[in-house]
């Protein structure tokens, strides 16, 4: 009940545009603490209890209330090691509290809680990222060229703040954000590593502005104006520029307008990569390439180079996307036809969208998480003394299950079998290390129970739909099946 009340208070503050007072609320940091604990399935978050203790949060709020927040980021205080530690702690706490404030209206739990109160309708944007692949399976077979785009980063932090002010109209929060960024500008590299979620939000906000303008020009439709940005004079000028731009294109540059209205153009993005695919010729794709480079530089003051956009033919190129390697391959098919007394064979080539999992990349991710070495040999993980055997097994099985669900759309399952073997043996080594015995003797004592934990999960969902004796169930398991409840990229699927 208290959590739901907190979400409703957030909604009230968000609708009225008053975000800055929420920084003084302790439940904000409790929400950030809870989301931090549930965010990763691989790493042990051992420092969360210290980082989000009520004593630290109250001390931080007291400093802000007393208008001593300049002391929090005072450079002279870095001479004291104890204060330097608190400095990093306070900055990280404020940054994650700020992110939870601006992120909370888009979280599924927030939407569900308000839906029960009939406050808002459920957002259509909260959909599975796996819905991209069924779309690609239907569309990409008819396309010819694809452009792999590395989205450039803004060259100055002020550009990020300018992009965010179109969505957040609370001037106090923006001033705090600007002061926060420029005060920590000297140690921005180390700070960004500790506060990845904070900088990821800023980056996504900047990309959102770029994409909203780009897709508006692409579709030549009315731009959906948000109520939170209509009061800014810069935004009004922006709408005027877009209107004038369309009029100029319609009157004088029909060729450029034709470029925007290409009905065979498809755009998909995740993280810092995006894909632009088209049925047109390579000349048309090169026009899009140089348009994007000029668009970034002139409209958003982001320096980019043509080398960040590579154009390839789909028949000779594979897409590295969302942890999969996708390609269009041709399957030869011989058809026998008979006319009266004569028969002949016809060779046809059928296009198929093939999706595989890169075993080398997955092993590299497992090695980075210390489940194995770079050659794929399983390693033992350090286990807590108070962890039971069932907790350790359940943790490894959960990782294996999440990987299996995420990569269930792969057309070849051999890579997943290797990953399951690594995780199973790593689990056995971890348990043997805990009991101070060998893996052989431990597996002999445990029997086939450990093996069943890792193997019985795969066919459970499919067997609920089809009988176990049905050949359809086995055929679906061998082929690709997409789980449409995937809302985030698996930690091990993110190879970058």
Swiss-Prot record:
Keywords: Chloroplast, mRNA processing, Plastid, RNA-binding, tRNA processing. It holds the Pfam family MatK_N. Belongs to the intron maturase 2 family. MatK subfamily. GO terms for biological process: mRNA processing; RNA splicing; tRNA processing. GO terms for cellular component: chloroplast. Usually encoded in the trnK tRNA gene intron. Probably assists in splicing its own and other chloroplast group II introns. The gene is matK. Transmembrane segments: none annotated. It is found in: Plastid, Chloroplast. Disulfide bonds: none annotated. It comes from Paeonia lactiflora. It comes from the Eukaryota. The keyword Transferase does not apply. InterPro entries: Domain_X (IPR024937), Maturase_MatK (IPR002866), Maturase_MatK_N (IPR024942). This is Maturase K. One of its GO terms (molecular function) is RNA binding.
